[in-house]
């Protein structure tokens, strides 16, 4: 797997659960109904979206967050994307 470069420069192992948890919280913030399968699918789409941004087996947390926003908007959840932006 690859590593995530955090804002403070520290490295952390990539964990899909962090992406899906953040998406889950954004849906909750908007009071939207969702299934865990849908959240998992959105998480997979996020990882596909940022694949080309991985360099030397590393990606920045900002690039991941940008991909979450892009995927939510593309999936028709612009209101959830706004909640995610506020959450991050």
Residue spans of the language-model regions?
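Long, C-terminal-biased catalytic regions of enzyme "large/alpha" subunits
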Residues: 1-88
